[in-house]
Each structure stands twice: as C-alpha cells, then as structure tokens.
Amino acid sequence: MISMEDQDFSDCSIIMINLDGLRKDRIQKCPTLRTIKEDNIYFSKMISVSPYTLAAHHSIFSGLYPSQNGVDAYYHMFRFKEDIKTFTEILKEKGYFTKADVISENIIPKRGFDEVG
C-alpha cells in the first residue's frame, strides 16, 4: 500500500469531484463532466463500501472501511474517530489550500479543510 504522506505532490493540482447518486453512464450526457473525465484521471471501477452517503464519503476521505473510521451505522454517523488522519489533512500539511463545496457540512469530515461551504 502506498502512503500519501510519502508522496511529493508539489507539481500537482488536485480537484476531487464527488457526485452522490450519479450513474456513471450519465456522465456522457453532460458535456462538462464528459470533458473532465476524458482530460483527467477518472476512476471507473470505484465500488462503494457502504449503501449510504455518510459512511461512503468518510471512507473516501480516510481510506478506511466504515468499521475502522467510526462512521459505520446511521446511529454512529457523526463519530468519525479523532485519531484518523484524512487525506485533506495530509494535503494541507503538504502546503495545499483545501476547500469543499458541499450542500451539507455533515456529509464529509471537515478536518483538514481551509474552507467548507
């Protein structure tokens, strides 16, 4: 397994677009998304670790299964473990400005973001 903490991202701009509930076959119907897909890195075989958004997104940000990161059930949805470092925290440590544009701030772990809105 490759650790993000050991990587040099100094020449990279990173934009992560996560659209909850978007079927991948619909990307071709949207010219903007189609262009982004064709001109950048696109992960075509992603499989969700959870059937609901909160656990799935917290797993994306932590790199851990819901049972490991603490967001493993509807009743534990806001108990993201404090000792887990998110990839946004790692990017911030590497000098990145990190920003999230989300409908609900509860959807993602806020740690490591300079701005959430």
Identify what each model region corresponds to.
Residues 1-50:
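Active-site-proximal N-terminal segment of extracellular/periplasmic enzymes that hydrolyze or transfer
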Residues 10, 56, 94:
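Residues that flank catalytic or metal-binding motifs in active/ligand-binding sites
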Residues 29-30, 40-64, 78, 100-112:
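Short, solvent-exposed turn/loop segments enriched in Gly/Ser/Thr/Pro and often Arg
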Residues 35-36, 55-56, 73-74:
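Short linear motifs at secondary-structure transitions and domain/linker junctions
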Residues 64-117:
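Catalytic-site neighborhoods of secreted/periplasmic enzymes
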